[in-house]
Amino acid sequence: MTNSTAPVVVIGSGLAGYNLVKELRKLAPEQDILVITADDGRNYSKPMLSTGYGKNKSADELAMSSAADMAAQFNITVRNNTRVTHIDTDAHRVFLGEEPVEYSKLVLAWGAEAVSPRIEGDAEDRIFSINDLEDYAAFRAAADGKKRVLIMGAGLIGCEFANDMTVGGFECEVVAPCDHVFPTLLPQDAANAVQRGLEGIGVKFHLGPLVTRVSRDGDGVSAALSNGVEVKADVVVSAIGLRPRLDLAVKAGIQVNQGIVADRLLQTSAKDVYTLGDCAEVEGRVLLYVLPLMSAARALAKTLAGTPTEVSYGVMPVTVKTPACPVVVNPPAADAAGRWIVEQEGNDVQAEYRNEAGDLLGFALTGAKVANKVALNKELPAIMP
C-alpha cells in the first residue's frame, strides 16, 4: 500500500539516476528523495571511461563530485555502497538485507552489466571489464607499468578503448568473432574505414576467431585463439557487450524482456515502479546511449512531480569516440526495409540507409563526412515521436 509520505527511491547513481534527481529537484523542491547505490555514489559521466587514458585521467579525476557532494547540492539522501536485495511491490518496500525501506514511487535506474566471457584458463583475475568508475580504477591499478593490452570485442566499447589506450601508450590487439568492427552498428564500408584508422595508430586486429583460453604467462597472459594463433599480453579487457540488469526485477515479479518493460510513461508492470536508462525497455526499445536517458529523465521527473508525461525520442545520433577515425551513426530500426547507399573517399564514408521511396531511415558517417550530420538529421524520422 502506498505511503504518500515515503520518499521517491531511486536505485542507481549513474547518469540515469542522478540526471533524474537533478530534473525532479527542479520541479519538486521539497520532495524527499533517496538514492540507493551499490557503488560509492560518485557522480561521473560513464562515456568518459573510454577517454581516460588519452587524457591521462585517474578515476578520481574523472569523478565530478562525491556522494556527499550530491546529497548536499540536491538535498537528497544517498545510501552508497548499499545493495537492494529484494523489492516488495505490494508493500511498496525495498529491502537492504533485513532493513526495509518504504517508497512512494520507485525508480529502477541500475543500468546494464558487462557480459562475462566464457573462456577457459587460469588468468581470470587478469581479465577486466570496465563498466563503471570502480572498474576503471581497478584496471588502471592492474595496468600500471604494463604495455600490452588484449581487448576482446570489436564493437563500440572495444574500439573506443583500443583508440584511447593506444593514444595512452599501450600496444593494443583486438580479437572478435566478426567480419568487421562495429558488426551491429555500422555497414561494412564505414566499419572498414574505422578499422583502417585504428590500424593507422597501431591497433592490431584479429577478426573472425574467438578467444578460447587465457592462461597465466609470467606476469602477463597468453591467449589462445580458435584459429590457432597465440596472443601475448599483460592484461585483458573484455568488451564483448552489455546487457540490462534484470535479476531484482524478475524476483519482484516485474515484467522483463530484453530490458525492464516500460510504457511511455516509463512505468513498469508494477504500480508506482518506473525505470529508465540502460536497464529499461521502452515500447520495445533498449537504447544504451546517453541522449535517450536524458529525454527519459526529463519526462519521468514531470511524471513524478505530478504531471504524467510520456517520453519521446527524437533523432538521436551516436557519436563514437574513435578520434583515429571519427564516427557518427544513426542506425536504422532493426525492422526497417531498405538498403545502404555509400559514397566514399578513403576513410571518409557517407552511408545512407534509404527505403524504396528514397526516404532516409539511418546513416553512418566517418572521417570528414561527420560534418554532414546536421543536414542528415533533418531528414530522419524521430525514433519515437
Where are each of the predicted segments found?
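Mid-to-C-terminal Rossmann-like scaffold of FAD/NAD(P)H-dependent oxidoreductases
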Residues: 2-7, 13, 26, 279-373
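Glycine-rich Rossmann-fold phosphate-binding loop(s) that bind the pyrophosphate
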Residues: 12-15, 131, 153-155
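Rossmann-like NAD(P)H-binding beta-loop-alpha module
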Residues: 138-186
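FAD-site-proximal beta/loop scaffold in flavoenzymes
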Residues: 123-144, 219-222, 229-302
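A Rossmann-like FAD-binding core segment of flavoenzymes
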Residues: 30-32, 77-95, 101, 168-262
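Glycine/serine-rich phosphate-binding loop and adjoining beta1-alpha1 elements at the start
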Residues: 80, 89-90, 95-141
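Phosphate-coordination loops involved in phosphoryl transfer and adenosine-cofactor binding
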Residues: 5-7, 81, 145-148, 208
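Beta1-alpha1 glycine-rich phosphate/pyrophosphate-binding loop at the start
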Residues: 2-76, 164-185
